[in-house]
Amino acid sequence: MLPPLPDFSLSVEQQFDLQKYRQQVRDISREDLEDLFIEVVRQKMAHENIFKGMIRQGS
């Protein structure tokens, strides 16, 4: 059996920010949303690489 996952809940401030973003994307074209999505995925990958590099340096 897998160990329980830590709580990844958003803070109240993060929930508020998420709601603002949700409202903003309603006015964006599908093409622009696709571009933004790809950029978010790219940044997430870069973040993972930074995190992995920090772990390697600490080992």
Curated annotation (Swiss-Prot):
InterPro entries: NblA (IPR007574), NblA_sf (IPR036904). Induction: Present at very low levels in nutrient-replete cells, and at 50-fold higher levels in nitrogen- or sulfur-deprived cells and to a variable extent (<10-fold) during phosphorus deprivation. Involved in phycobilisome (PBS) degradation during nutrient deprivation. May mark the PBS for degradation by covalent association with PBS components or may disrupt the PBS via ionic interactions. To chloroplast ycf18. This is Phycobilisome degradation protein NblA. The gene is nblA.
